[in-house]
């Protein structure tokens, strides 16, 4: 619905675990896929179909697998629990062409520390859009928290 209502918006799908979910997401208008882990079957499927994919990684072996599959961007998940920005910096050192998109534990207080590192292309965070806020129809609060995140990035 979002992709149809707002065609200028880049809409993707997250927590994609299977090729069937890839197909459903793309058919619903997703332009890119993000997954919590590196499933070679899902990555190859996306690459073969020309669908941008960002699989989750949390160690050098995952990064090397991503490189072998032709990727140069990975999700680092769960970021804070897996060592945060210091772990990303350590992993980025030998993999000079790799870029990272951390998610998991990112919030308004640590967002800038991630985005200040040049190897970070984006951060994901659910702190702005909690289920309770959505279910409660608290869209002004979501708007306020989203604006706060944008202001941090400026």
Where are these regions (language model features)?
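Glycine/small-residue-rich loop that forms an oxyanion/phosphate-binding "nest" at active or ligand-binding sites
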Residues: 1-59
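Hydrophobic faces of well-ordered beta-strands that scaffold small-molecule active sites
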Residues: 11-14, 33-34, 53-56, 74-76, ...
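Catalytic cores of alpha/beta
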Residues: 18-28, 61-69, 92, 106-122
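Generic structural signal for well-ordered alpha-helices
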Residues: 22, 43, 63, 85-88, ...
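Glycine-rich phosphate-binding active-site loops on the catalytic face of alpha/beta enzymes
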Residues: 36-42, 75-85, 119-141
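C-terminal helical cap(s) of enzyme catalytic domains, especially alpha/beta-barrels
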Residues: 46-51, 132-154
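Anionic-ligand binding region
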Residues: 49, 60-74, 84-94
């Amino acid at each position: 619905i979002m992709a149809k209502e707002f065609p200028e918006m880049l809409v993707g799908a997250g927590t994609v675990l299977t090729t069937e979910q890839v197909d459903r997401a793309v058919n619903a208008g997703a332009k890119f896929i993000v997954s919590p882990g590196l499933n070679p079957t899902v990555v190859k499927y996306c690459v073969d179909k020309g669908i941008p994919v960002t699989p989750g990684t949390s160690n050098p072996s995952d990064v090397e697998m991503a490189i072998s599959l032709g990727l140069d961007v990975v999700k680092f998940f769960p970021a804070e629990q897996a060592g945060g920005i210091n772990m990303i910096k350590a992993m980025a050192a030998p993999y000079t062409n790799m870029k990272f998109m951390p998610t998991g534990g990112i919030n308004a207080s640590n967002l800038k520390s991630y985005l200040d590192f040049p190897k970070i292309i984006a951060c994901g965070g659910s702190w702005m859009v909690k289920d309770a806020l959505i279910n409660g129809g608290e869209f002004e609060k979501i708007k306020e928290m989203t604006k706060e995140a944008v202001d941090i990035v400026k």
